Swiss-Prot record:
This is Peptidyl-tRNA hydrolase. Keywords: Cytoplasm, Hydrolase, RNA-binding, tRNA-binding. GO terms for molecular function: peptidyl-tRNA hydrolase activity; tRNA binding. The keyword Glycoprotein does not apply. GO terms for biological process: protein quality control for misfolded or incompletely synthesized proteins; rescue of stalled ribosome. Monomer.
Length: 211
């Protein structure tokens, strides 16, 4: 089961609504779902909440170290409570996935994400779970830093929030350790409903002047 849920982002009001803070948004949504409140914990260099689920302690963490030092916070809490990497899930922004989608995976490279890079280094492994929240790509590599540190357009923000709410449907499976079910829930989105069409003979004649 997942015992430590981490959301990546940067602290401070100037970063709160930026794409790079999508992981923070996810943890905020999970905290609301579990009815817990994140509070500062200096020992773990972040905002922390503890929930009790089926007799097990579950931890929520938002590192307050700034993105590039996220591993310091994650490793401090994981080591103190003896949580192995395979029981950690890190929610983060993902350039290679469009807004409105999220993907669940275990292990793999950090793909240039500095928060993941530091977690790799501090845990000494990449063998932890990631929830990759799509923020889209600016199309030009040179614009990536500017892109992640800017606010998404309102329609993109709505899509990102929709994907966060959709992926939260998987949290009971994550807590139960049913990662196949969790993956299916995260990756499956409802296709748009086809528009109902009337039989030709049943259609009313257009009124004069309706054009």
């Amino acid at each position: 089961m997942i015992k430590l849920f981490v959301g990546l982002g940067n602290p401070g009001p100037e970063y709160e609504a930026t794409r790079h803070n999508a992981g923070f948004w996810w943890i905020d949504a999970l905290a609301r779902e579990l009815k817990v409140t994140l509070v500062p914990e200096r020992s773990y260099h972040g905002l922390v909440a503890r929930a009790s689920v089926a007799g097990h302690s579950v931890w929520l963490l938002q590192p307050q170290t700034f993105m590039n030092l996220s591993g310091k916070s994650v490793a401090a809490l994981a080591r103190f409570f003896k949580i192995p990497p395979e029981e950690i899930l890190v929610a983060h922004d993902e350039l290679d996935i469009p807004p409105g989608q999220a993907k669940l995976k275990r292990g793999g490279s950090h793909a240039g994400h500095n928060g993941l890079r530091d977690i790799h280094a501090q845990l000494g492994t990449s063998d932890y779970w990631r929830l990759r929240i799509g923020i889209g790509h600016p199309g030009v590599k040179a614009e990536v830093v500017n892109w992640v540190l800017k606010k998404p357009a309102p329609d993109q923000r709505t899509l990102i929030e929709d994907s966060i709410l959709h992926s939260l449907k998987a949290y009971p499976a994550l807590l139960a350790g049913d990662m196949d079910k969790a993956t299916l829930l995260v990756h499956t989105t409802k296709p748009p409903r086809p528009k109902a069409t009337r039989p030709a003979q049943a259609q009313a004649a257009p009124q004069a002047g309706a054009d």
